[in-house]
Amino acid sequence: MVTKGVVVVSSFRRSRQDANRPHAFLTGIHAPVKEERTIEDLAVTGTIPAELSGRYVRIGPNPFRADPRGHHWFVGDGMVHGVCMKGGKALWYRNRYVRSRNLQDAGGPAAAPGPRRSTFDTVNTNVIQHAGRTFALVEAGSFPVELTHDLESFAYSDLGGTLKGPFSAHPHLDPLTGELHAVTYDGQTLDTVWHVVVDREGRVRREEPVPVAHGPSIHDCAITAKYVLILDLPVTFSMAALVGGARFPYRWNPAHRARVGLLPREGTAADVIWCDVDAAYVFHVANAFDNPDGTVTVDLAAYETMFAHGPDGPNGKSLGMERWTVDPAARKVARKTLDAAPQEFHRPDERFFGQPYRFAWSMGLPAENAEDFLGHAPIYGYDLATGQRSAHDFGPGKIPGEFVFIPRRADAEEGDGWLMGYVIDLASETTDLAILDARNLAAPPLALIHIPCRIPPGFHGNWLPDAAD
């Protein structure tokens, strides 16, 4: 258990570290931006599809005080970056800090109102839209933060008093029911994770506890028609790292049993079917679905290890895109490489999430591990029916982040639509919001929305469409 004494020792050890050491996630492309900007009537090269009416909003860490002591990329103060589009125009770009108490204590803007779960209330990992509301999310601690349409106002939310425990940075919408599913964990509770379901109205209807060991870090999950998939893999809470001063105390743990849990969607912990898998780590899944023979397929980005070689950020060897077949009868998982190219941030056409599907897209990673995780690499597209891979390369010095798929229409065929994401230009310290044709990935962008400042690499973004008239 993390006691006040442990926190005091951790703070002391951190204070003894070198405050001037270079930190890959506080310098260069990751250097925090200082100014909150509002830029209207953005310049555009190409044509924004007229059907796009809404906002693209991404969030990531942007430390208000860039102190390398004990710092990890995953714990920086949250900042949202959004672009609003309507009628073929880019109306505005805004970036705003998420108004946490931690930010206020560091000298930043006043904290937002609303309930807190703990003293650490930084939110920096995902932005979603659900039940007509916009939420910024983080895992393992804080409640969600609700944002207004213009990103100008923030309020912490326990979803009307219905969220009793932690939430996730990676809930998934079931397109057939309209509910959000998440697997959540809490750094203060090392023996339990939870399956949380948020209904169509934005209220929690289920928080089902599942016993685990060692406090695993479970960033993502998957669903099928039958199951919720729990990725219980060997990155776990490390008291030694915390006592040593780490702000993100999770490390590779070879003693932790690697397994995938199949939890029936309305089942209890007693119903989980645990299936062993060779040790690996997974941040993100592409999709999962049930097979007629009773097995479950899940496609994902796999790593050989994670957080085994240094405390600053992701540092494991990417194994590319893998397909795992989870066999509840044998209680085993078979692994198959779909593409060994290093990659991350897989996204499907999310109208088909939890169902058999054909298309997925991902962000390439450098062929050699980069100290700051990122580098020149393409956006990949996969046709899983034919095995064909396509790619879009933005050119030297252009660093893309996660790209999200947006269907052309609600009833469009799978994969018929656009990809959207931020691309950093290292030379000019500017950013483009790029819009690509998902079915012709190698073609020039349909539109580049020019943002005259660098948006630091972040985590997750989403297209948040305006409500239909």
Swiss-Prot record:
Subunit organization = Monomer.
Q: How is the co-factor bound, per the entry?
A: Binds 1 Fe(2+) ion per subunit.
Q: Which reaction is catalysed here?
A: all-trans-8'-apo-beta-carotenal + O2 = 2,6-dimethyldeca-2,4,6,8-tetraenedial + 13-apo-beta-carotenone
Reported pH dependence: Optimum pH is 8.0.
Keyword presence, Cell cycle: no
Q: Which GO terms describe its molecular function?
A: carotenoid dioxygenase activity; metal ion binding
Name under which the protein is recorded? 8'-apo-carotenoid 13,14-cleaving dioxygenase
Q: What lineage is this protein's organism placed in?
A: Bacteria, Pseudomonadati, Pseudomonadota, Alphaproteobacteria, Sphingomonadales
* Organism listed in the record: Novosphingobium aromaticivorans (strain ATCC 700278 / DSM 12444 / CCUG 56034 / CIP 105152 / NBRC 16084 / F199)
How activity varies with temperature is described as: Optimum temperature is 45 degrees Celsius.
Question: What is the role of this chain?
Answer: Catalyzes the conversion of 8'-apo-beta-carotenal to 13-apo-beta-carotenone and C12-dialdehyde. Also has weak activity with 4'-apo-beta-carotenal and gamma-carotene.
Q: What is its EC number?
A: 1.13.11.82
Q: Is Oxidoreductase a UniProt keyword of this protein?
A: yes
Q: Which UniProt keywords apply?
A: Dioxygenase, Iron, Metal-binding, Oxidoreductase, Plasmid
The cofactors named for this UniProt entry are: Fe(2+)
